[in-house]
Amino acid sequence: MNQSAQLFSRARSVIPGGVNSPVRAFRNVDGDPFFVQSAKGAYITDADGRQLIDYIGTWGPAILGHAPQPVLDAVHAAVDRGLGYGIPAPAEVDMAEMITDMVPSVEKVRMVNSGTEATMSAIRLARGYTGRRKIIKFIGCYHGHVDSLLVAAGSGALTFGEPDSAGVPREMTQLTLTVPYNDREAVKKAFELHGSDIAAVILEPFPANAGLYFPQNDFLHFLREITLRHDTLLIFDEVMTGFRVAPGGVQQLYGITPDLTCMGKVIGGGLPVGAFGGRSEIMDCLSPLGPVYQAGTLSGNPVAMAAGLAQLRELLKGNAYERLEQLGARMEEGIREALKKHGRNYTFHRAGSMFCLFFTEEEVYNLESAQKASKKLFKSFFWNMLEQGVYFAPSPYETGFISTAHTEEDIDRTVEAVRISLSRLG
């Protein structure tokens, strides 16, 4: 039994399922996970010494690669000053100023400890600010494990939410309306029926937790227009896309100003961090200024702030975003050529350094279309890639991430692994 197998056996006796987050269990690929010993740059080394090119990047935060030296230096310096204070510290102010500079829609920001905390707090704030109860979310958009947002769709275009997890009472989701992403008519119907009681519309502007797909027919501008017309807040969950697809996220690319933005991942530099921010008049409803309570013992942790600041500063130096685009384009070109060579018209989506390969020849634009992709083909592809030393996400519904630490050689080696893996699919 190898080291990873031994560790997984031990883990299952003390950790539910042997993992601390479900996707890590490899259930979607019918296997057991490997355990990581270390990570540096674009590579991870597992407990048995195997080195892999990594395209998970801790699920998004590692935009500079693993353990970048500027971030390590900042963390070491911060640790020497103390691990946490529970008292305001300069780094919190520096981080808030950095975020408000990079994301113009954010006039004020509150730090939290995860993306889940950010979306949970933003929803509470939206309800407190508007005095309304209902929320619209989109099927396939993931906003953390918040009770009211763990909702699956029922039949029809518009449903009152049914819980998507045991332990979530139906009453917790009854105020959440779910509609298909990219479906204007469903959104219009929701506002026709409930417009006066809709506090907010929340979405991932690029849904990236059901594969990766994009708005069609000016969908994001449509949402901004209809929410303004109904005095409803528009919340962009840019935990995935923020500071990655562009310094200011998807909202910068599309020229849209949401009322609130949820952030995380990249702004932590690899440590646990989340944030939510928006217009001052909305944010000032938060305690201690306003009636909406939100708090956190470790919010604004000085070590996490130091890591995040160092990462953001590095991103703004030189040509990091241009570099990420070049690497992403190189991968896309290579994978598309490989698909063409093997006569497979599978759908490949990319936004800068984010990417996803769907094993379907149909267009993917929402969760329903994403679910038409072959899980059987994906599973075979995943294990073939891993055998060749390339680690893609162990789920057909996850996004891959490129970092500035990847090289052209890494990309070319990955494309060659894709070619070989496709040839083995039969």
Curated annotation (Swiss-Prot):
It is found in: Cytoplasm. It catalyses: (S)-4-amino-5-oxopentanoate = 5-aminolevulinate. It comes from the Bacteria. The modification N6-(pyridoxal phosphate)lysine is found at K265. Pfam families: Aminotran_3. The keyword RNA-binding does not apply. Its EC number is 5.4.3.8. Keywords: Cytoplasm, Isomerase, Porphyrin biosynthesis, Pyridoxal phosphate. One of its GO terms (cellular component) is cytoplasm. Its cofactor is pyridoxal 5'-phosphate. GO terms for molecular function: glutamate-1-semialdehyde 2,1-aminomutase activity; pyridoxal phosphate binding; transaminase activity. Belongs to the class-III pyridoxal-phosphate-dependent aminotransferase family. HemL subfamily. PANTHER family: GLUTAMATE-1-SEMIALDEHYDE 2,1-AMINOMUTASE (PTHR43713), GLUTAMATE-1-SEMIALDEHYDE 2,1-AMINOMUTASE 1, CHLOROPLASTIC-RELATED (PTHR43713:SF3). This is Glutamate-1-semialdehyde 2,1-aminomutase. It comes from Akkermansia muciniphila (strain ATCC BAA-835 / DSM 22959 / JCM 33894 / BCRC 81048 / CCUG 64013 / CIP 107961 / Muc).
